[in-house]
Every structure is written in structure tokens, then in C-alpha cells.
A protein has these predicted regions:
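Short loop/beta submotifs within extracellular cysteine-rich repeat domains
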Residues: 18-22, 85-86, 117-122, 133, ...
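Membrane helix-loop-helix hairpins that form the core translocation module of multi-pass transporters
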Residues: 3, 33-97, 102, 151-174, ...
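Selected transmembrane alpha-helices and immediately adjacent juxtamembrane segments
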Residues: 95-121
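Short hydrophobic "helix-edge" motifs at membrane interfaces and signal-peptide entry regions
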Residues: 8-10, 107-109, 154
């Protein structure tokens, strides 16, 4: 049961490194200089977005055997590893919403929209298909988002300029490849191959 919380937390925290929502957090922190409403907006947006993604994943998971889900999870980890190596860029449309609303509402809207189709949302779908405790998966993916984004919000421009993002992306990609290997091993076990 603890895996349903800890694995999603780690996976999403790794996937979020250098992601466009992390860049968005940095921009919002620099623009508003009010970290707590921004963090609250991240929590609300992530819970809403990942709850929907988790529901889709739980529904999706009901159609497949454990072996098939392990193979799908392994493929998604490999894809996420490759995706992690590509730096995200923040769209100008997402940054332009900051003028219309305050820090909380701007963050809520911008993060919710930025997460649609993002690798962390896709990871949430796959994790919810894999683990039976949906609420723990959603809490875990939300914690992962916070682990990656809260330091960026609190540190602002200073931390983002000093971090070796290329090295961090490579380490995160390596971690995803390791997770893919573990998932392949579990898929082979579930398929009766080993």
C-alpha cells in the first residue's frame, strides 16, 4: 500500500525536473513574489488535474491483466525517460494569464492547463492503472509536483540559474530507465517468462 504513495511521488518529482510547469512556477514566483498563494494554486490545480487523470487510469487499468499493465508501464517509463531529456519551453499564452488574475487564480488556471497532456499527467494515468489505491496515487503525484516546484517557487530566480538542469535531467532519465527495467522484470514475471 505504501508503494501506491511513494512510487508516484518519486516518479512525478523526477518527471517534473525541467518541465514547463517548473518554468511556470519560476515565472510566477518572479512576477508575484508571493510564494504561498502560488503554492496553494499548484496544490489545487494538481489535485484537480491528477484526480481526473487518476480516474481515467483506474478505469483503463480495469481492462488489462497485471502482465499487460506491467508492459505498458515499462513502455511509459522508457518514453518518460526520453521525454525528460528534452527541455520544455513555456508557451507565451500560459505566461500571459498572470496579468488578469492574482497569484492563486493565475497559478491554478495556468498549472491546470499546462498539465493537460504533460508527462506527469500521463504518468498519473499509468500509475493509477497500476495501483489499486487511487487516492494514494493522487496524493503521491501531488506530493511529487510539490517536491519539484515548491523549492523553485521559494528560491525564485536564484535557484533556477544555479542548478545544473542538464545534469539533473540526465539523472532523472537514468532513474526512469531503471524503473523501466524493473517494470520489464515484473512484466516478465507476470507473463510467466521467468
Amino acid at each position: 500500500m505504501l508503494d501506491s504513495l511513494l512510487v508516484p511521488t518519486a516518479i512525478v518529482a523526477l518527471a517534473e525536473i525541467g518541465d514547463k510547469t517548473q518554468l511556470l512556477a519560476l515565472i510566477l514566483a518572479a512576477r508575484f513574489r508571493k510564494p504561498w498563494p502560488i503554492i496553494a494554486g499548484i496544490v489545487a490545480a494538481t489535485l484537480a488535474n491528477h484526480a481526473a487523470a487518476g480516474a481515467v487510469g483506474a478505469w483503463f487499468g480495469s481492462f488489462f491483466s497485471d502482465a499487460v499493465l506491467h508492459w505498458i508501464l515499462a513502455a511509459s517509463f522508457c518514453a518518460t525517460a526520453l521525454w525528460t531529456l528534452v527541455p520544455d519551453k513555456l508557451d507565451d499564452d500560459e505566461a500571459s494569464t498572470t496579468r488578469k488574475f492574482g497569484p492563486f487564480l493565475t497559478t491554478l488556471i495556468a498549472f491546470f492547463l499546462a498539465e493537460i497532456g504533460d508527462k506527469t499527467q500521463i504518468a498519473t494515468v499509468m500509475l493509477a492503472a497500476q495501483y489499486p489505491e487511487l487516492w494514494l496515487v493522487i496524493i503521491g503525484t501531488t506530493l511529487g509536483m510539490l517536491i519539484a516546484n515548491v523549492p523553485v517557487v521559494l528560491a525564485g530566480n536564484f535557484a533556477a540559474e544555479k542548478l545544473p538542469l542538464t545534469l539533473i535531467r540526465r539523472l532523472a532519465a537514468t532513474a526512469f530507465f531503471i524503473l523501466a527495467i524493473v517494470a520489464v522484470y515484473k512484466a516478465m514475471q507476470s507473463s510467466g517468462w521467468i
